[in-house]
Amino acid sequence: MEPIGRSLQGVTGRPDFQKRLEQMKEKVMKDQDVQAFLKENEEVIDQKMIEKSLNKLYEYIEQSKNCSYCSEDENCNNLLEGYHPKLVVNGRSIDIEYYECPVKRKLDQQKKQQSLMKSMYIQQDLLGATFQQVDISDPSRLAMFQHVTDFLKSYNETGKGKGLYLYGKFGVGKTFMLAAIANELAEKEYSSMIVYVPEFVRELKNSLQDQTLEEKLNMVKTTPVLMLDDIGAESMTSWVRDEVIGTVLQHRMSQQLPTFFSSNFSPDELKHHFTYSQRGEKEEVKAARLMERILYLAAPIRLDGENRRHP
């Protein structure tokens, strides 16, 4: 059997191998970043080190070094995905160290924010809402901004704060505002959940059959910051009012957990909605008790403006 060393000598001594090696070396030495690195370290790097580290230098030039050609929508092609290489001198060799790239940091931050902002049955296009997109020319929006600013300050300092009950005509941007508040919280690394109430109620009714009702209720009861979107649009029954909404709000009130609401109804109109069940039963005391919880948790602000969904 031919010794391995002699076999390797045979391969490396072949003309085609030597040609490829020279082409690789030429490509490496023409690279501007490599040239700059060698010049910067010319006192410690000699030709022998370059020859010894040729494979590392080639690995370096074949990768994106500054993410200038990367897109957030593309997969990273680097050896270590999401990291860019930097040449370093390591003893008598040239080596590569990898650093997290700006694009990866940004995407990781976005994923973290998305994980903090949970939603149930909310349109996906609304979940990217920010206050930078909000028209503040309307006085009602200025009042809302002031309250949100005060809330964030209080929540940051104490973990508590009074939410908002946003009400107004269909399409004036109430859900958008809730999503913007949730994103603002996520930027500060606070968790929240937005729930579209009518669909949530329908799911809870179905959960009576698969015995997941308590689990779903507890998730909404205990989330750090809750936003109930379109309260009052659900089909009103005594069970919905007392066992679902009432139970959730009682827990959140007792634990002082911040809660936000949006509705097409003013507080008085919502009270009327909760007074009458589908059967026509009139229960003013229970409706009043529920409204007390809502107004304890949230300050009412009317949002004015045109219908922004259908110009």
From Swiss-Prot:
It is found in: Cytoplasm. Keywords: ATP-binding, Cytoplasm, DNA replication, DNA-binding, Hydrolase, Metal-binding, Nucleotide-binding, Primosome, Zinc. Disruption phenotype: Essential, it cannot be deleted; in depletion experiments DNA replication slows as soon as the protein is degraded and replication stops by 1 hour. One of its GO terms (molecular function) is ATP binding. It is an enzyme of class 3 (hydrolase). Its EC number is 3.6.4.-. Belongs to the DnaI family. This is Replicative helicase loader DnaI.
